[in-house]
Amino acid sequence: MDGKKCSVWMFLPLVFTLFTSAGLWIVYFIAVEDDKILPLNSAARKSGVKHAPYISFAGDDPPASCVFSQVMNMAAFLALVVAVLRFIQLKPKVLNPWLNISGLVALCLASFGMTLLGNFQLTNDEEIHNVGTSLTFGFGTLTCWIQAALTLKVNIKNEGRRAGIPRVILSAVITLCVVLYFILMAQDIHMYAARVQWGLVMCFLAYFGTLAVEFRHYRYEIVCSEYQENFLSFSESLSEASEYQTDQV
């Protein structure tokens, strides 16, 4: 990869991945230090520790909850920006727009879910928190499969297979983790369910980091123009100009 030919926009998915993963691990270590959750490598429950190391429990009490809310809000914003830019990137290249639109809507709903689970802690409002979790995991998984299909179909710069196959593999791993997570939860095997949850989230973040492969080929610009109430068409402008020149003669 030639750094001189890469767009700076390639760093957006990477910043999303690195920032969110680092923030979540900071929340985890704060919660472990305060004895709010068990460590992920713990084999037995310690006295005084209340919960298995689920992410929701880690970010349930201050000060970890403050960091968790901020991380999830920033992650939701960055994911929304990535969703819009990815949609714009693929829009002129897909014949059937519905798959691209579905990818945009799915990631927007997943982003909304991030704000719900980040701002409504589990013990404060369990119902809304669980809705946010379902939106994030459900539509996040759907987004992964849609983007994997679009990657193979559009084949930007003939890199479709190189980027698409790892995304298909990650999508399969994410789907397996989601199913396994709910199975373990239903059987009250909480330590293993928590480990699967952390693995699931890290796979999500790694997946979106791979979007840097296509983003490095594109440059995005925001065009700002002043609104003119009495806007004249090009022909009207020429007509006025010719009349002015006639008057001068």
UniProtKB/Swiss-Prot annotation:
Does the keyword section mention Oxidoreductase? no
**Highest taxon in the source lineage:** Eukaryota
Reactions that this protein is recorded to catalyse: Ca(2+)(in) = Ca(2+)(out); Na(+)(in) = Na(+)(out); K(+)(in) = K(+)(out); Mg(2+)(in) = Mg(2+)(out)
Q: Where are the transmembrane segments?
A: 10-30, 65-85, 98-118, 131-151, 169-189, 193-213
Q: How does it sit in the membrane?
A: Multi-pass membrane protein
Q: Which GO terms describe its biological process?
A: cellular response to mechanical stimulus; proprioception
In this UniProt entry, which residues form the Extracellular topological domain(s)? Answer: 31-64, 119-130, 190-192
Q: Which Pfam families match?
A: Frag1
Reproduce the miscellaneous comment text.
Answer: Tentonin comes from the Greek 'tentono' meaning to stretch.
- Relate the protein's function as given in its record: Nonselective cationic channel with high permeability to Ca(2+). Component of a mechanosensitive cation channel. Confers mechanically activated (MA) currents with slow inactivation kinetics. May contribute to proprioception.
The protein's name in its UniProt record: Transmembrane protein 150C
Instruction: Report the source organism.
Output: Rattus norvegicus (Rat)
